[in-house]
Amino acid sequence: MYGKVLCGVLGSLLWVMPGWGQAEAEKERILARFYPYRQGLPQVAGITPGMRIDHTNYQVAAAALPAEILQYVQAGDFAITVQETTDMPLREAYIRATLDHFARVELHDGELRHYVAGLPFPLIDPHDPKAGEKIAWNHRYRDRGETVQYWPSNELRNRDGVVERADRFYIAIVFGMHRPAEAHNLPQWAAQGVYSKNYMRTLAPSDVEGNQVLTCSYDRDTSPDELWVYDVKTRRIRKLVDNPYQAGGGGELLMEDRSGFSGYIHLYEWRYLGAQVALVPGPIRTATPSWGGRGNWYPLDPWELRYVDVVEARPTGSHPVYSRRLLYVDRQTSVTLYALAYDLAGNHKRTFLNVYLRPAFGPGRQGEWVPHIAAQASIDYQRERASIFQTHRVVANEPLNLNRFSIVGLMLYGK
């Protein structure tokens, strides 16, 4: 009886307060985005956990893989083992910040307004002409924690799998703005509009050991990054003009290709191509990923089916390498799972395969889980070689000495 009365009262309230009912419905839709697998796991006919997909049965994955990747499974370049879909919920604080602030966020003439924290656009209308651009902003402000330290390596491998060059680094990143709890932002950085700072030190090989790079990224997408480089040989610091189209170390990864896409949003025209279930590299259950296939280019840890949004990005101006790129963005975490890039003639040139650490696994201290990258394979099929970026240790959300993230710090930490 009490339950019937309560339902009647709530029904009356919803009738007289339609705004409240709409807000609750929006909240449920947002939570469904952050927890998409609680109502069941995605399925594609013929694909089941434990199966192996290779050149003998590649057709089974035709609905879940882009043709640009499927053709190399068909050719026998690599094979895929399938695992069950992994639920990877983000931090509760990030989800709560999304619910608290999303309603006021606006996209006006390519600029984000009234953004505070969390996911800027948790509700994507597929018919919205700005849907693709909104997903790009979601990717930019995905949950990456407050601080993170990586100890990665990068190898340039040729068609035979021979490593032509290998580098090792220490990377530390601090996000000074848009933390889930506003009180935890860095006031001085926020006053200057500094979103994040990235410190990188080269550990090997010996000819470049001790070189340092400090990158300052601003919250405004139209404000270019500032870069300072410390040269260990001259013990001098130079300020460089940011070039997102530069490939470090002569590899197959432009600066803007990192994590699938880390370039300037305003330099591209964005188009939403739709949602789908895709077969993608799954989060690994080991400290480091396994490699194999042609050239030792491909991550061999199991792949899995996940809900993704597919977005196309075309340069609004001239680009030295690409005419367009496709991003396959994870619905739950807003990370890019893989990306495809096309040359100026429109031919498929590069594939970027991103592998992430699984919750409760991975090297180092991760604290509350955020999707840290374990590896990125950047494969150039025209040049027949690949850059393999791999993380060997991660320490997340621990206090860092901010002196390191300054020009003075480059001198202090210089050899």
Task: Give residue ranges: language-model regions.
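Non-transmembrane domains of secretory- and envelope-associated proteins
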Residues: 20-119, 233-234, 247-298, 306-307, ...
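Solvent-exposed N-terminal domain segments of exported/luminal and surface proteins
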Residues: 23-224
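Active-site and channel-lining beta-strand-loop segments
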Residues: 228-230, 325-331, 339-343
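Extended beta-strand-rich segments in extracellular/periplasmic secretory proteins, especially
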Residues: 95-98, 158, 166-191, 199-204, ...
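Bacterial N-terminal signal peptides
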Residues: 4-16
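Short, surface-exposed coil-to-beta transition loops
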Residues: 209-211, 223-224, 320-325, 337, ...
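Loop-centered beta-sheet repeat module
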Residues: 207-266
